[in-house]
């Protein structure tokens, strides 16, 4: 299954993207199409001794910058690397598109070229978080900041399907992020969403608090993109700060330094667990195809793992399973019934 990589997106493109693509092809045997400036990409590939690797180049004459307006750039820059990567998916020449460029443009390109899955009103960006018991999927982390209850219900279905078919969780437990576990907590959005989700076939556990995310008892955590992005950035900042604080304390005395020698292996394993590069990119859910959004400052390892994850995402037919799950749950009719009950109550 060939992966189209937007080689011109990202803070250090195309150097990091090319090296990550080469590593993915070499380590996982995944065929790659690099999309971008042909001459620059050819020169980058020459540095990596790629003879025998299934990597080709698709020329793109334009690049969407990090500060470009996402929707305008996609429409104006028809030959941009990110848009053409999704065009390759649409044409069946690649099974997924991976980009570390402008995340808004990546999402816009995916929606514009591949369109939304029937029954999905808004796309969502998901992210895997490390927990005490393994991994938890959180969505949305920034795709749609202003949501309605039906959007969150759709996110829950997409997250459940992804957790089941890509993460390999047999019966994913779904939770709705709120400011308390009691039914009386939350705001209008979460309370209405809670009512909807309780009527679905999902293994729904109700409200969860932010502190519960890392316990690992919930497999899929649902929230709007505004809250989700704050959760993501806070978690990244906390992990980085905790590591730096610990290092400062270790360096304060020779006793601490000596003790570190005995637990150095454990610290290395911990750093690996909280390193975003280990989890690759964030899947874009809700489009008729596969898109993977990477951090703008992604490392070679992050790009490599994002390509691997994109291949798994495509191989497991997530979009098709989402359609099946939507049909099974009749979310829109549930919302209409809920609205009627509220009208009667008023």
UniProtKB/Swiss-Prot annotation:
Enzyme Commission (EC) number: 2.3.1.274
Metabolic or biological pathway: Lipid metabolism; phospholipid metabolism
SUPFAM superfamilies reported for this sequence: Isocitrate/Isopropylmalate dehydrogenase-like
Annotated catalysed reactions: a fatty acyl-[ACP] + phosphate = an acyl phosphate + holo-[ACP]
Top-level enzyme category: transferase
A single cellular component GO annotation: cytoplasm
Quaternary structure (record): Homodimer. Probably interacts with PlsY.
Similarity annotation: Belongs to the PlsX family.
Protein name (Swiss-Prot/TrEMBL): Phosphate acyltransferase
Naturally occurring in which organism (per UniProt): Pelobacter propionicus (strain DSM 2379 / NBRC 103807 / OttBd1)
Lineage: Bacteria, Pseudomonadati, Thermodesulfobacteriota, Desulfuromonadia, Desulfuromonadales
């Amino acid at each position: 299954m060939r992966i189209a990589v937007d080689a011109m997106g990202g803070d250090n493109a195309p150097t990091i993207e090319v090296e990550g693509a080469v590593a993915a092809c070499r380590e996982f045997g995944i065929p790659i199409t690099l999309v971008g400036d042909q001459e620059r990409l050819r020169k980058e590939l020459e540095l990596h001794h790629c003879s025998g690797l299934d990597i080709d180049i698709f020329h793109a004459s334009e690049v969407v910058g990090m500060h470009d307006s996402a929707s305008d750039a996609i429409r104006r820059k028809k030959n941009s690397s990110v848009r053409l990567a999704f065009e390759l998916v649409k044409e069946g020449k690649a099974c997924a598109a991976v980009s570390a460029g402008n995340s808004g443009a990546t999402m816009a390109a995916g929606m514009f070229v591949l369109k939304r899955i029937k029954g999905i009103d808004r796309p969502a960006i998901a992210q895997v978080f490390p927990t005490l018991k393994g991994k938890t999927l959180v969505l949305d982390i920034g795709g749609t900041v202003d949501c309605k209850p039906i959007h969150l219900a759709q996110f829950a279905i997409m997250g459940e399907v992804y957790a089941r078919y890509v993460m390999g969780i047999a019966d994913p437990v779904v939770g709705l992020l709120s400011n308390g576990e009691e039914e009386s907590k939350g705001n209008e959005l979460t309370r209405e969403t809670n009512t909807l989700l309780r009527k679905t076939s999902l293994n729904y556990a109700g409200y969860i608090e932010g502190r519960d995310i890392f316990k690992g008892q919930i497999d899929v955590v649902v929230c709007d993109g505004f809250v989700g992005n704050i959760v993501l950035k806070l978690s990244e900042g906390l992990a980085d700060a905790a590591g730096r604080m610990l290092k400062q304390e270790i360096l304060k005395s020779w006793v601490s330094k000596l003790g570190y020698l005995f637990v150095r292996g454990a610290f290395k394993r911990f750093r690996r667990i909280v390193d975003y590069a280990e989890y690759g990119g964030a899947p874009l859910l809700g489009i008729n195809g596969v898109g993977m959004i990477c951090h703008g400052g992604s490392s070679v390892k992050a790009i490599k793992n994002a390509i691997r994850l994109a291949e798994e995402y495509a191989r497991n037919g997530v979009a098709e399973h989402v359609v099946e799950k939507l049909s099974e749950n009749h979310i829109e009719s549930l919302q209409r019934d809920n609205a009627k009950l509220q009208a009667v109550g008023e």
